[in-house]
Amino acid sequence: MQDRQKAQDYRALLLADTPLIDVRAPIEFEQGAMPGAINLPLMMDDERAAVGTCYKRQGADAALALGHRLVCGDIDQQRLEAWKAAYQRFPNGYLCCARGGQRSHIVQRWLQETGIDCPLIEGGYKALRQTAIQATWQLAQKPILLIGGCTGSGKTQLVRQQPNGVDLEGLARHRGSSFGRTLNPQLSQASFENKLAVELLKINARQTLKRWVLEDEGRTIGANHLPECLRERMAQAPIAVVEDPFALRLERLREEYFIRMHHDFTHAYGDEAGWQAYSKYLHHGLFAIRRRLGLQRFAELTDTLDRALAEQLSSGSTDGHMAWLVPLLNEYYDPMYRYQLEKKAANIVFRGTWQEVANWLKAQ
């Protein structure tokens, strides 16, 4: 049997969606983690902070002794049972701490004492993180084609249909606009970058890749920003622009923001709480751009939104939303995107309807 006690082939681990039993403190995990990792800490945040303070004041031996005192008895047993259960669930998993140091070795030794031989990641999360950063930089050097178009053009759907397409908005859990958030909270910046790196590695590994197909995005997608190496390449990339009829764009937006989001909120929270969350979501999206709309126009559109919500609640009809969505597109989103696109006019290589762009992509 191959010795798995330590792992250094980091790309292979990431490509395989290798389960990681991450024993870092919750605050470290929240700041950045790898896809597929589960957080079962050796020390909680307050315990880690106490050990860190002890290390600075009294040295490594005293800190280690304090750590053993903090994690003992019932606490020790509870955490050990959690690690055992995780390994039984993921027998191909690895232990991971910050740098492959004391914490993962301690947990590994405790598991060995129960008859479980769980390998660890040599270099820990830091090594995996560096691998992800390097992979993104390397793979971003491949040619890129952007899919552009005004809001409601179906760009994301088109990207998802491409074998070499990377759904940046899906990875970011955000659709890019002020109404772009989903029910799933966004990842931390580092976790988003790690997830992006793994996606790039996977797509690159399963085909002979000539170029990436990405949606034309700004620097940020919600709270996440694109890695600079990728953003720089996107700024110079050719663009295929989707130009669908306005009415078709409205129907896509109706389906995505009024029908699907209402369904998702009520499915997650129940009818009453879900309706309140859905209403709050739409109001928040409008509120986020109030200064750009002007406060008077914002107030007018908010009144229209309130009437549309009342109509939807009473009859189920989403038609009333068109009364604020149409001016929002005409006065804000469309002019903003067209202005941005004008600055990249030299990069445009094709224009057409959604289907025409899809056919053009197949022919490339």
Curated annotation (Swiss-Prot):
Location of the active site: 97
Domain Rhodanese: start-end pairs: 14-137
E.C. designation(s): 2.9.1.3
Name assigned to this protein: tRNA 2-selenouridine synthase
Any Pfam family matching the protein: Rhodanese
Family named by the database record: Belongs to the SelU family.
Superkingdom: Bacteria
Gene: selU
Reactions mediated catalytically: 5-methylaminomethyl-2-thiouridine(34) in tRNA + selenophosphate + (2E)-geranyl diphosphate + H2O + H(+) = 5-methylaminomethyl-2-selenouridine(34) in tRNA + (2E)-thiogeraniol + phosphate + diphosphate; 5-methylaminomethyl-2-thiouridine(34) in tRNA + (2E)-geranyl diphosphate = 5-methylaminomethyl-S-(2E)-geranyl-thiouridine(34) in tRNA + diphosphate; 5-methylaminomethyl-S-(2E)-geranyl-thiouridine(34) in tRNA + selenophosphate + H(+) = 5-methylaminomethyl-2-(Se-phospho)selenouridine(34) in tRNA + (2E)-thiogeraniol; 5-methylaminomethyl-2-(Se-phospho)selenouridine(34) in tRNA + H2O = 5-methylaminomethyl-2-selenouridine(34) in tRNA + phosphate
Subunit field text: Monomer.
Single GO biological process annotation from the record: tRNA wobble uridine modification
InterPro entries: Rhodanese-like_dom, Rhodanese-like_dom_sf, SelU
HAMAP family in alphabetical order: tRNA_sel_U_synth
Provenance organism: Salmonella enteritidis
Signal sequence annotation: none
Matching PROSITE patterns: RHODANESE_3 (PS50206)
Keywords carried by this UniProt record: Selenium, Transferase
Record keyword Transferase present: yes
Function (record text): Involved in the post-transcriptional modification of the uridine at the wobble position (U34) of tRNA(Lys), tRNA(Glu) and tRNA(Gln). Catalyzes the conversion of 2-thiouridine (S2U-RNA) to 2-selenouridine (Se2U-RNA). Acts in a two-step process involving geranylation of 2-thiouridine (S2U) to S-geranyl-2-thiouridine (geS2U) and subsequent selenation of the latter derivative to 2-selenouridine (Se2U) in the tRNA chain.
Gene Ontology molecular function: transferase activity, transferring alkyl or aryl (other than methyl) groups; tRNA 2-selenouridine synthase activity
Keyword Transferase tagged: yes
